[in-house]
């Protein structure tokens, strides 16, 4: 086998998975833009951290990146218009999607493919709805509402539910997990019917 053939044989599909916990009204943050204590849940956090630890790349908005310390040293891609294109920094890759398209980022950052975790926020979630999620792990805190808060997707501000947005993006609910029944938190995993890397 040629060297090129050996390299191609090791390449994996790019699998993109979103992760979020929302209130009953599909908000991911309060009016101040921050995650309130009412959306913090230990079981959800443990699930989320296991998922990040098993990912090859984690895509954050710059605010989320700053608020969530990278204690494991995960490979991060920070979405920001503060950079000219795609830059390697001490704390990870920084990417301006206005200047460089996703396929070029993948070629540079994940040349052998792999699992991509997308924890948001809203602008990043909206962008990956267009790029294409393979799965979305949507936790919900029942009994919690955040009037005036930030929605998980901008389309929710126009009257669509998070589920309707995911369905329009080609995903379907495939599994429901009772993460923490005592505190009213469950998760629905949405998946694309035909899986495939980009």
How would you label these PLM feature ranges?
Residues 2-198:
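Enzymes that bind and transform nitrogen-containing heteroaromatic metabolites
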């Amino acid at each position: 086998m040629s060297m090129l053939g050996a390299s191609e044989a090791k390449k994996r599909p790019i699998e993109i998975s979103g992760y979020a916990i929302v209130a009953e009204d599909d908000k991911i943050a309060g009016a101040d833009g921050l995650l309130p204590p009412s959306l913090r849940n230990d079981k959800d956090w443990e699930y989320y951290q296991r998922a990040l630890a098993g990912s090859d790349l984690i895509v954050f908005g710059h605010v989320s990146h700053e608020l969530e310390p990278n204690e494991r040293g995960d490979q991060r891609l920070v979405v920001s218009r503060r950079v000219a294109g795609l830059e390697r920094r001490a704390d990870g890759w920084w990417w301006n999607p206005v200047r460089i398209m996703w396929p070029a980022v993948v070629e540079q950052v994940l040349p052998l493919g792999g699992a991509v975790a997308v924890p948001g926020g809203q602008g990043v979630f909206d962008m990956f709805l267009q790029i294409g999620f393979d799965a979305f792990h949507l936790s919900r805190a029942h009994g919690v509402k955040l009037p005036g808060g930030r929605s998980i997707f901008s389309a929710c501000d126009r009257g669509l539910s998070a589920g309707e947005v995911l369905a329009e993006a080609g995903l379907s609910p495939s599994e429901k997990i009772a993460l923490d029944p005592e505190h009213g938190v469950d998760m629905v995993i949405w998946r694309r019917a035909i899986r495939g890397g980009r």
